[in-house]
């Protein structure tokens, strides 16, 4: 079976899922992008048999109804008040987003923006897998932004990873999307040089100023 990478968050899902695809391909991992976890794609699509990973954008609506979805890597990009017509409170919305991680096991990965992680902790949400954090603002994150440099403080992988000035994408929100993709590569042991080439060449999807 191919493994799932699930990406959720209020903003940045499309850009990040495409960045993650680029990073996977740079590491010779076969991947396909999907946008709906209503169907267990791995069991249905014959072509996924040849895949290593299915990279999925996951909305809060899909997370409301999912019971069994288990991404081997779950990414939470950010949490901002959204769909307020649908949820009774921001806390409620955040709890729904956290369902991305509910079926994970201890060897799975949670890649989570520091600020989103603080919010989940305040709601007593537990992340079962191994956790990596990122942030454009918080320098205590595993990967953070300092004067345009993406810097890691992960043991055995520390130091500057990437200069945003070398990338087509710009701005702190895109820096965070890039950090999430780099951390997927780190979890899968994809060489940094290969990832950097893919990320630096990446152009934003059309109409995705975010």
Language model regions located:
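Phosphate-binding loop of NTP-binding sites
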Residues: 1-114, 118-130, 144, 185
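Adenine nucleotide phosphate-binding catalytic loops in nucleotide-utilizing enzymes
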Residues: 90-91, 129-210
